[in-house]
Amino acid sequence: MSELLVTGGQVLRPDLTVERADVLVSQDSGDIVAVDDPGTLDGDDELDASDGLVIPGLVNAHTHVAMTLLRGLADDKPLDAWLQEDVWPVEAELTADDIRAGAELGLVEMIRSGTTALSDMYFEVEEIADAVDQAGMRAVLGFTAVTVGKDDEAARSDLEESLDVARKLDGAADGRVRTTFQPHSLTTVGEEYLREFVPQALEDDLSIHLHANETRDEVTPIVDEHGQRPLAYADNIGLLDGDTYVAHGVHVDDSEIDLLAETGTGVAHCPASNMKLASGMAPVQDLLDAGVTVGIGTDGAASNNDLDMFDEMRDAAMIGKLAADDASAVDAGTVVEMATANGAALLGFDSGRIETGANADLAVIDLDAPHLTPAHDLVSHLAYAVHGSDVRHTVCDGEVLMRDRTVEVFDEQAVRERASEHAASLVERAGD
């Protein structure tokens, strides 16, 4: 058995206490074998965690990883105008090679900032799955289906592809890839199609992921057309259950919060994107108080504009307090749990905690920095002070993805150069 020892540091335990300990992981099973006193464990390989904090690998619960190619392309617009005037015209020109290049860039960015698992919505999912496999990460992937603006044949083709991709790729990358059926949103997929295809997904035991209640402009048309709130409409169709998680959930009322809790439907909160697009402030503390599982996602780099989950934790805590008008709301420990254990629960992975038997997904934070001094409360630092660039090592499934800030699973320079070339070509094609 090949074992990796993470030694010399402090460890964040599942109850959010911090203790000095070593962590031993099996590189055969990909699990944590032991967490014990310093000097009591031995491994075949070691990672030095001196002056560091060992934390669970972060979980990006909602993103569009290949949209790194659109980073900085269009800013300072509301969601609908941004999508229709800038994003969708460029996305129409995307090739499979573009998406692979953008995905690799995004995965490198995540590895460098301690993220080990992600939930992605996009196209050319086989390319993204291959990139995830090479990266050694975990992911929930799916093909995002849209029916608006399409004839019946094209609409059905989209939804069939979403089902087929989910069936085909589930369990890829030695089980590190899971899949979801992905109708884009309640306003971009017609009711007749949802009523036909959602039961097929449920019959195949596929989880479901979609955008919901992101902006007021998504809520009003559904209320006007169907006479009920969006999540009540979704529940009527059969979309809400314990294997469904929605992205955003910004404009939800009390009845919808109760409905999410009753059905076991989770929420991927994307605070930076919601702020940048002026979509609104999600009532995260109300969701948590009701028992809803809430994870954190970056959304795409085009609306964020990075994939740093530490930035996202800080944003989630800040905007959560504003939304609740309560400085004690969405506290430091809560956002750390949202970015780790809660995110893992949404995605269905046995990770998000440093504990014997859990997936060996972890990151080591270098605490030897001015902005992390003094160390009164390391959980506070994780939520409010740590940057992605403070990550020293990243491990997923027991394998070292980054050692001493050097990514080992990709040629980072080549990935960056290739992504830049594809981005330039993409924008040029879209402008023709």
UniProtKB/Swiss-Prot annotation:
EC number: 3.5.4.28, 3.5.4.31
UniProt binding sites for substrate: E91, H184, E214, D299
Cofactor, free-text remark: Binds 1 zinc ion per subunit.
Keywords per UniProt: Hydrolase, Metal-binding, Zinc
A molecular-function term among this protein's GO annotations: S-adenosylhomocysteine deaminase activity
UniProt KW Hydrolase keyword: yes
Class of enzymatic activity (EC top level): hydrolase
Residues annotated to bind Zn(2+): H62, H64, H211, D299
InterPro entries: Amidohydro-rel, Deaminase_MtaD/DadD, Metal-dep_hydrolase_composite, Metal_Hydrolase, MTA/SAH_deaminase
Annotated catalysed reactions: S-adenosyl-L-homocysteine + H2O + H(+) = S-inosyl-L-homocysteine + NH4(+); S-methyl-5'-thioadenosine + H2O + H(+) = S-methyl-5'-thioinosine + NH4(+)
Cofactor section: Zn(2+)
Role description: Catalyzes the deamination of 5-methylthioadenosine and S-adenosyl-L-homocysteine into 5-methylthioinosine and S-inosyl-L-homocysteine, respectively. Is also able to deaminate adenosine.
HAMAP family reported in the protein's UniProt record: MTA_SAH_deamin
Family as reported in the entry's similarity comment: Belongs to the metallo-dependent hydrolases superfamily. MTA/SAH deaminase family.
Identification of the protein by name: 5-methylthioadenosine/S-adenosylhomocysteine deaminase
Organism per entry: Haloarcula marismortui (strain ATCC 43049 / DSM 3752 / JCM 8966 / VKM B-1809)
UniProt lineage: Archaea, Methanobacteriati, Methanobacteriota, Stenosarchaea group, Halobacteria
